[in-house]
Regions:
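Hydrophobic residues within well-ordered alpha-helices
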Residues: 5, 146-151
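Alpha-helix boundary recognition
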Residues: 74, 126, 148-150, 167-168
Length: 205
């Protein structure tokens, strides 16, 4: 299992652990416990399966200058040519990266916002939308690919496979590293304690 899940490290270096960082919710204090352990135990809450980190995708051939900050998503220079992910639980994280990069607010923990922070983040998005900043709010992989491929959008929330899909069309597209870092995510597989299993390991009923 990768050290990212076990210790919150990549290549021996600690990574940001705001929100539900895998290593903070991986271990349980006991077999039937509902309390996460602060150090490794023999009881795991799930089996880690996949992780990645997302950032902004850009069309360097159309932007023609360096992009180094999440704040560029709300730069008036790109009015009407930006897009953000429209899956609330993920999109608000991208929005928070933008809010922090613009110096509007510094979050203690983007993954555990206060009500006031949620309100501020949503208010920032609403104002940008009303001002015509966004070409679209996408929630489908293919939609993000089409927006970028067509040139309707030059900078947007993007997943790495979508960037690859745009490149496969012979179109310049960059999965852009930013000073504010990436928005990371992880997933795992777990079985509910209510599941009935027979001696052969098959689910009953």
């Amino acid at each position: 299992i990768t050290p990212l899940f076990l210790k919150g490290e990549v290549a021996g270096k600690k990574v940001g652990d705001q929100g539900t960082a895998p290593h903070k919710v991986l271990y349980l204090e006991a077999e039937k416990s509902k309390v996460f352990a602060k150090s490794p135990t023999q009881f795991m809450s799930l089996i880690p399966t996949v992780y990645n980190a997302d950032t902004l995708g850009i069309r360097p051939d159309l932007i023609k200058r360096p992009i180094e900050s999440w704040a560029e998503l709300l730069n008036p220079e790109f009015k009407g040519k930006t897009a953000i992910l429209n899956i609330p639980s993920i999109g608000i994280m991208d929005a928070a990266m933008v809010v922090e990069a613009k110096g509007i607010h510094k979050y203690k923990d983007k993954g555990n916002m206060t009500k006031a922070e949620i309100d501020l983040t949503i208010k920032t998005l609403i104002e940008a939308k009303k001002a015509g900043q966004f070409r679209a709010l996408w929630k489908d992989f293919n939609e993000s690919v089409n927006l970028m491929s067509s040139g309707e959008v030059v900078i947007q929330s993007m997943w790495s496979p979508a960037v690859t899909a745009v490149r496969s069309k012979g179109i310049a597209c960059t999965f852009q590293p930013l000073k504010g870092g990436y928005r990371a995510w992880a997933a795992g597989f777990g079985l509910p304690t209510t599941m009935l299993i027979d001696a052969q390991g098959c689910e009953l009923g």
